[in-house]
Structures are given as structure tokens and as C-alpha cells.
Amino acid sequence: MTAPRSVDPRPRPFQLAACAEMLWPDRPIEWRAARLTEMGLGVGLWNWDSHDLDKLAGVGARYTIMNGYLRGRLADAEGAAMLLASAGEAIEVGKRLGVARLNLHGTGLGDHGIPLSRHEVVSGAMWLQARDTLNRICDLAEREGVVFTLENLNQRDHPGCPFASTGDVLALVSSIDRPQLRVNLDLYHTQIGEGDLIRWCERCLPWIGEIQVADNPGRFEPGTGEIGFAAIATALVRMGYDGPVGMEAFAQGDSDAAVAAFVSAFTPAPAVSVA
């Protein structure tokens, strides 16, 4: 492994991490996890069943989040049973790797993020079933001592995904209001779906388990698109948020440079007092 690019030495107000699945695509996943660890970041994963868990465990990485299921859906009884069984498997893997949070979506995602079960209209009955399913997830999480998150998505990249909007995710998580279920606030998806990012951070703040970021358009690292991440980082500090911020983005060019850009964007300069 070559020496890692130097990282920003300033104190970091957030718990920074990056998704290993999207960086250094020509390298094995355990190499990517080790690289992020060397750079002082936590490591996010997607579907754990495609990786060698022994190698990942041997890295000594701080794994921050991974998919909390491989099968299942929120909004129907059959899908809920599948989801709960799959979540149980994910919990065992998460404990083995020491993963902090297990992530859920409104339904399973297939190739290129296309929902396996698409719904143009979400009925009241589906809302009630989703809330019941998530409460059962919380019961499981409480027994096992783990935390799940529910992530918002955008309908352009994930057409027909139920409970995908930022508002839908916040409504479900806040109405359940249990510590075993938090919001995974993905600002890339919020920017496409709703915009108004700082206000959404404020609304979601009491229930945020993690904030994920990528710039838009392109889903590359901060600084490659239209989102003002420096302003968002400053606003989060002002709100008192000091929790996890994960880059779930592709590198527009060099992956080391992408990580450095992310760290810089979420390491705000200290405030200067004026006499």
C-alpha cells in the first residue's frame, strides 16, 4: 500500500467516514477499508454478503454503517417477515465487524438502485404496515443492542421507491420515536428531491443517526457540484450536531483527493472572535 495522502490536521467537529464501496474501484474492499482507516476515517459498507468478512474484520477499521438487510420490504406483511429475518442476519454480521448502524430503505434495491418493488402511490394501509414493521425492527434492535437507520432516496435515481422522500423518512422515524431507529439523512438525495438542505437538517436533527453527503450533479465528492457544503458544515456546528457525517460518493478523479476534499469541507475553520 502506498503512503496515504496527508489529511487535514485541523480538529474535526464531526465523526467522519466514507463509503468504501465507491472509492478505489480497482482495489479489494479490505484494502479500501484499510486506506480509509489510515486516513483517520470510519468505513461505510453496502451489501456485506459479497465480501470476505474475515478479511474485513482483520483490518481493524471503524465500520460506521452497512446495509441492515438483504431482502424484504416495509409495507406488506410478507415483505416485513422477510425484512425481519434478513435484519437478524445483518445484526450478526454487524456485531462481528463492530458496525455502528444498520441501514434500511423503503424497499429492497436491485441493479443500479432500482427498487425491487415499485409503487407510484403509497396507500394509508402501506403507511400503517411500514410503521408496524419498523416498530418490530426496533423491538429486535432493542433486544440485540443495535441501532438501525432509515435512509431517504430520490425518485430520479430510485423511481417508485416507497417512503423515499426526506419528509416520509422523518415522518416514520419521528412518529415511532425510539432510539433504535434513526434517520440516515442523505443530503445528495435531499438536494435532488427537495432542496432546502439546512432546514431539513434542522427538522431532522433530533432523530439523525448519520448524515451522508455527495455533490450534485454526478454524485461525486464535495466541491464538484452545486451544493454549498461549507455552509452546511457551519450550520451543523451551530445546531450543535457533532455526530457521524459519511461521504457516500464516487471520486470524480483520484480517490485520495476526493477523501481530502470531503474532510476539508467538513472541517470548518474555527470562529474568530471580534473584540
Regions found by a protein language model. Name each.
Residues 1-39, 98-100, 109, 135, ...:
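Histidine-acidic metal/acid-base catalytic patches
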Residues 22, 49, 62, 67-70, ...:
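Short, flexible active-site-adjacent loop segments at beta-strand->alpha-helix junctions, enriched
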Residues 37, 57, 95, 138, ...:
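Anion (oxyanion) recognition and catalysis
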Residues 17, 30-47, 62-78:
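N-terminal substrate-binding region of glycoside hydrolase catalytic domains
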Residues 44-47, 64-67, 103, 149, ...:
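Conserved beta-strand positions in the central sheet of alpha/beta enzyme cores
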Residues 3-10, 76-182, 192, 272-274:
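Active-site acidic/histidine proton-transfer and metal-coordination neighborhood
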Residues 42, 62, 100, 147, ...:
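Residue-level detector of anion-binding/catalytic polar loops
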Residues 49-58:
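Active-site-adjacent beta->alpha loops and helix N-cap segments on the catalytic face
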